[in-house]
């Protein structure tokens, strides 16, 4: 059986705040809209996300994409 991989909203928010970035700053640096970042952070498990979005956010936060995901 395959594991379900999801973008973890809690991890995203925790890393963003630890890096001292606002949602707006992360949006500017990643080219991901503020509303998308807000939606991702307010949902604990985001099973429907675009891999390029994950990559953009990880680069802007200077972390590996795997740091932003969870799985079951």
What are these regions (language model features)?
Residues 1-18:
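A short, Lys/Arg-rich alpha-helix, primarily the initiator
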Residues 13, 24, 55:
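Residues within the helices of the helix-turn-helix
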Residues 13, 38-39, 69:
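Key DNA-contacting residues within the recognition helix of helix-turn-helix
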Residues 16, 27, 58:
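The alpha-helix within a helix-turn-helix
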Residues 20-40, 44:
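Short alpha-helical DNA-recognition segment
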Residues 44-59:
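Short, basic-rich loop-to-helix N-cap that marks the start of a DNA-contacting helix
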Residues 62-72:
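Short C-terminal boundary/hinge segments that cap the last helix of small helical domains
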């Amino acid at each position: 059986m395959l594991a379900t991989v999801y973008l973890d909203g809690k991890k995203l928010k925790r890393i963003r705040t630890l890096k001292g970035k606002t949602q707006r700053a992360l949006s500017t640096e990643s080219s991901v809209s503020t509303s998308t970042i807000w939606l991702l952070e307010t949902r604990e498990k985001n099973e429907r996300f675009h891999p390029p979005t994950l990559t953009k956010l990880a680069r802007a936060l200077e972390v590996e994409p795997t740091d932003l995901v969870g799985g079951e």
